[in-house]
């Protein structure tokens, strides 16, 4: 262990020193030694935050070790201790070491990603609203069977990994709650993960109606630093049985962890795109293995990774094939061609919207693009309005009358003529939710219409909750939105779901494109008819022969997953192999190009030397991609990458780690590594 008992050390009449970790990038020294003055010797403990002077600035550091061994160099003194008790447990410290090794990340960055409140000087407790009254629930036979199976394993202390595959509206939450009750009755604690922060609002209402709200904590990035610190301290002190949150909640410092629930496990939001590119599912598996805890993953659209796992009996599959509400029926699904359509809302969808409003029901319209119009193009010469800082087209936002880049967020005045040939007419090739809202309001001026996308929710605190609550309370007739409306929300009065342009955002260069499209359309379709006998889903698309869309229409999820799985296996794609990616960014394209070439050559030489030494024991490794990224430039930085594949992830982690350790960094080039990347864009 990297720490010692400070009380034992203080019994000796010797100076005390602390090794502290300061957040630094991979390959840069992170551990430094500071003297502990006598007035702090009784306070300092492993896992506490300390304030130190580092390179002339007051910096927050994490105490990683305490000793009496006097260093051979002059040391500065710790300025003060920020915590009364440790905020990192031995388990989390060991977990951070594993994450650092697996994902080839800086150990200090991993630790500091756990305590993102590192600069908070005081703590506040998250305040729950008054609980709603618990509804009387009548279980379906399938729910009852699933609950009995899980509870039997828990009673017999036979740790299992479960996959709850249930159609949308089948009552997966009730199965989760029953498992949680059993765990808490055994004095165990629970982590409940959801993919989006917005989904915590509805879930918290249900949780506080069922469980003691004083024993529930919330962890997600929308909390202030002081709120997050307050919740973290409650958890680590043993005051909490249930932690609910988005992906970072998987690191909650619960003692006696007994169960991790991962709802909507297919969702790509569980993969971090920050400094430490972890997947919450991988971390959940590791924590359950360490703590001998149960895991329940659930979705209506299993990821190919989990589909492969329960096909190979590595996960115990539980099925919910029917909706929980007795009167609810499967929605009728129509696919409507929108090829070269002159209007955003097709005549078929327009008629369905009118019928829905006449029947006093509600509708959800989904489009996976925000903004008003996309891809401003000159019909005369083909010029496209591109972001000068990124290799992507600009998006027109009518409410601000500006062209905006959705990557670097640069804004430019709207233009009325081509900047290449000066033609006075320009056209847009696609559109966003803002235009859909305008057209719907023009078609149905009497309807109450709301929009839910990042442009709207970024305007203030609790905007998401307010809009979704108004829709739930039937104060809104039509809700227009991006992926925010597709995930996990439960609206009882929705009888129509319209998908405006199903292929929007579909990227052929993404090997997961078909899977993501299927998941998205199936999930958004599931928002309708959850408590109604009759409901419709109308999918507008440029490609009516799309395999994912036909699978949704024909209710052939098994066939679709089998086909995608077989294709991935044939082409040696995840989950049948692991991918590892090194991505470089530089303002000088030549530097990025030269650096990726050096990295590729070093890795190939290293791998060849390993083969020459012990060929029979070294797994196969291949280069999947090399050169410019699909999006060649972002934020004025040119992007190059190298993608490796192997069935053994440890080999990939080792090759990248050794490369970063031994190659001299190139000034002006930033390196990012990613194990099991979600995409290769």
Task: Write out the residue ranges for each language-model feature.
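Accessory, non-ATPase domains that flank or precede helicase/AAA+ motor cores in DNA-metabolism machines
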Residues: 1-299, 306, 311-327, 618-620, ...
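A general secondary-structure junction signal
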Residues: 22, 65-67, 115, 367-369, ...
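Hydrophobic, Leu/Ile/Phe/Ala-enriched alpha-helical segments that form helix-helix packing faces
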Residues: 440, 471, 524-528, 603-611, ...
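Intrinsically disordered or highly flexible coil/loop and linker segments, enriched in small
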Residues: 105-109, 362, 446-449, 530, ...
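Long, largely alpha-helical accessory region at the distal end of helicase-like NTP-driven motors
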Residues: 567-652
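Inter-lobe coupling/hinge segments of SF2-like helicase ATPases
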Residues: 158-241, 245-593, 641-642, 650
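Residues at or immediately flanking beta-strands
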Residues: 364, 393, 448, 620-622, ...
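A general secondary-structure signal for short beta-strands and their flanking turns/coil
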Residues: 13-17, 29, 464, 534, ...
């Amino acid at each position: 262990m990297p720490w010692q008992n400070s009380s034992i050390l203080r019994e000796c009449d010797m100076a005390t020193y602390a090794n502290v970790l300061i957040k630094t990038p991979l390959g840069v020294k992170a551990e430094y030694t500071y003297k502990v003055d006598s007035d702090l010797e009784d306070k300092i403990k492993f896992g506490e935050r300390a304030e130190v002077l580092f390179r002339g600035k007051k910096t927050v550091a994490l105490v990683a070790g305490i000793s009496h061994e006097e260093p051979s160099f002059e040391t500065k003194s710790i300025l003060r201790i920020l915590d009364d008790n440790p905020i990192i447990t031995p388990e989390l410290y060991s977990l951070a070491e594993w994450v650092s090794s697996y994902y080839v990340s800086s150990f200090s960055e991993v630790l500091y990603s756990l305590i993102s409140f590192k600069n908070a000087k005081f703590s506040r407790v998250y305040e729950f609203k008054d609980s709603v009254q618990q509804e009387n629930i009548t279980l379906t036979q399938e729910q009852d069977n699933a609950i009995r199976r899980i509870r039997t394993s828990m009673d017999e202390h036979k740790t299992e990994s479960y996959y709850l595959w249930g159609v949308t509206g089948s009552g997966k939450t009730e199965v989760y709650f029953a498992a949680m009750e059993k765990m808490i009755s055994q004095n165990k604690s629970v982590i409940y993960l959801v993919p989006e922060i917005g989904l915590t609002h509805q879930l918290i209402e249900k949780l506080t109606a069922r469980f003691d709200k004083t024993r529930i904590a919330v962890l997600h990035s929308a909390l202030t630093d002081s709120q997050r610190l307050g919740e973290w301290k409650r958890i680590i002190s043993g005051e909490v049985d249930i932690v609910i949150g988005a992906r970072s909640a998987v690191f909650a410092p619960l003692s006696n962890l007994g169960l991790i629930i991962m709802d909507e496990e297919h969702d790509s939001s569980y993969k971090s795109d920050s400094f430490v590119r972890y997947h919450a599912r991988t971390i959940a598996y590791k924590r359950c293995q360490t703590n001998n805890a149960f895991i329940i993953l659930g979705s209506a659209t299993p990821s190919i990774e989990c589909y492969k796992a329960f096909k190979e009996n590595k996960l115990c599959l539980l099925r919910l094939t029917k909706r929980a509400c007795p009167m609810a029926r499967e929605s009728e699904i129509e696919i409507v061609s929108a090829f070269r359509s002159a209007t955003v809302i097709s005549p078929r969808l327009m008629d369905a919207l009118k019928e829905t409003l006449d029947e006093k029901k509600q509708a959800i319209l989904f489009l996976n693009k925000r903004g008003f119009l996309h891809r401003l193009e000159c019909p005369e010469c083909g010029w496209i309005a591109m972001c000068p800082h990124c290799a992507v087209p600009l998006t027109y936002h009518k409410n601000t009358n500006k062209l905006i880049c959705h990557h670097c967020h640069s804004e430019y005045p709207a233009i009325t003529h081509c900047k290449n040939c000066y033609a006075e007419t320009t056209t847009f090739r696609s559109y966003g939710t803002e235009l859909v809202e305008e057209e719907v309001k023009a078609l149905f001026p009497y309807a109450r219409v709301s929009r839910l996308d990042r442009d709207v929710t970024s305007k203030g605190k609790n905007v998401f909750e307010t809009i979704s609550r108004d829709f739930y309370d039937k104060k809104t007739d039509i809700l227009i939105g991006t992926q925010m409306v597709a995930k996990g929300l439960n609206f009882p009065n929705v009888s129509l779901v319209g998908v405006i342009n199903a292929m929007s955002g579909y990227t052929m260069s993404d090997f997961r494109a078909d899977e993501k499209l299927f998941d998205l359309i199936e999930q958004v379709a599931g928002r309708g008819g959850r408590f109604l006998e009759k409901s419709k889903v109308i999918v507008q698309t440029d490609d009516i022969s799309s395999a994912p869309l036909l699978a949704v229409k024909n209710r052939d999820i098994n066939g679709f997953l089998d086909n995608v799985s077989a294709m991935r296996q044939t082409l040696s794609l995840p989950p049948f192999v692991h991918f590892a990616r090194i991505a470089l960014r530089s303002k000088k394209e030549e530097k990025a190009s030269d650096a990726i070439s050096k990295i590729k050559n070093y890795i190939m030489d290293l791998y060849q030397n390993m083969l020459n030494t012990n060929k029979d024991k070294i797994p196969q490794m291949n280069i999947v991609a090399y050169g410019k990224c699909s999006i060649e430039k972002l934020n004025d930085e040119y992007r190059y990458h190298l993608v490796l594949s192997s069935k053994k992830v440890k080999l990939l982690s080792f090759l990248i780690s050794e490369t970063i350790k031994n190659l001299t960094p190139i000034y002006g080039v930033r390196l990012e590594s990613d194990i099991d990347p979600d995409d290769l864009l």
